Amino acid sequence: HRVDRRQRQMCIRDSDKGLFVLAATSNPEAQTLQRSVSETGRAVSADIILVVSARNAEHSEAGEWGSFGFVIGATVDWTDAGIAAFAPVAPVLAPGFGTQGATPADLHRRFGSMSPAVIASESRSILSAGPAGLAAAIDARVAEYREAGRG
């Protein structure tokens, strides 16, 4: 059963939920599409952010975060991806911290003014501590993110 655009919009509006849209991931196989230039002359990643940000602006009160967020890899170079800070602020799910290369100290450097909206995602680096060391690994990483947030 195919859902048309009007039905999708009604479902989104009536559900009062949010979602994350893939915008600029660090997956090598996605870069061909996400970094390609669309008919607008911008990178597809930039177009995704512009369209979703416009939707967020239309459906959010002034000063509120948008309910549609973005997946932007923690190791993605924003300039190379053709993206920049966006408004209204929306959550950013950022996989790639830990084993994949980004550190808590990179959070502000990589995400700039958007860093307060970032949900830093890492798992392998924490899970590598094993069952006995898991709680200590989580506590240590939380302390690193708190310290990075003060900087």
Spans of features found by a protein language model:
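Single conserved hydrophobic/aromatic residue that forms the stacking wall/gate
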Residues: 1-12
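Short, hinge-like loop/turn segments at secondary-structure boundaries
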Residues: 13-15, 37-40, 110-112, 137-138
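Active-site rim beta-loop-alpha module in soluble metabolic enzymes
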Residues: 15-95
